[in-house]
Amino acid sequence: MLSVKNLKVAVEGEEILHGIDLEIKRGEVHAIMGPNGSGKSTLSNVLMGHDKYEVIDGEVKFLGQNLLELAPEERARLGMFLAFQYPKEIPGVSLVSFLRAAYNAVRSEKMSLYHFKKILEEKMELVGLSTAFMSRSLNEGFSGGEKKKAEILQMAVLEPRLAILDETDSGLDIDALKTICDAVKKVRAKDQSILLITHYPRILDYIAPDKVHVLMEGKIVMEDGEELARKLEAHGYDYVREKVGIKKAGLKIVN
């Protein structure tokens, strides 16, 4: 479904991703883990087409199409979705208006407000968000957990083929995290792929990955199954540094 080969990315002339390789098949869950500043969110933004980043080498294909030639809205229509780590507040734009516009933007047939509200009510019940939020401005005055629920609600409404969840666990306590993960599992289609971007392994207690990738210094330095996340939980990222030969001071790759 998603194929990333030798992806190199720069910001303001400085290379920050150094040859990323990643393969995600239909229906798989992959987790990208790494310490702060390792390039995790950069990768998710590049996949969705953020114009801040310059792709200087490599290939990215989704469903056989060259993603690097597509605008962000074209990637969304193709079936990609990004849940943001820090969802923005949009005063004056109601949740229902925003979601209906997003829904109609990725489909050839437009849906009336009446019929869309019927669908939205069902999705809101799945994610545990009151229908009272429909008329509220998007994310304005929402708690951290409510903002994350609104992101998962977008995922439920848009039904993407690949959902990228960028540190969805950030800022959530254990109870809120479990609630969000339960919502993800409820709205996820069987053939939907998920790319989890996370710093901590605790989210993987609730959403089991098929594969875990460790990103450091802009490179994927280790890959394995779910057991790799358990090793990181027990030993921290020093476990990876020792295995692959990365100096903690300065974090320079020495192998």
What is the role of each PLM region?
Residues 2-4, 17-19:
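Conserved structural motif at the start of ABC-family nucleotide-binding domains
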Residues 151-152:
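Hydrophobic anchor residue at the start of the ABC signature
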Residues 82, 86, 92-107, 119:
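Q-loop/switch helix immediately C-terminal to the Walker
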Residues 164-168, 175:
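Walker B catalytic motif
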Residues 155-156:
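ABC ATPase C-loop
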Residues 33-35:
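The feature captures the beta-strand-to-loop junction immediately N-terminal to the Walker
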Residues 215, 219-242:
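Conserved beta-strand-loop-alpha-helix hinge in the C-terminal portion
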Residues 59-75, 139:
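ABC ATPase NBD Q-loop/coupling interface
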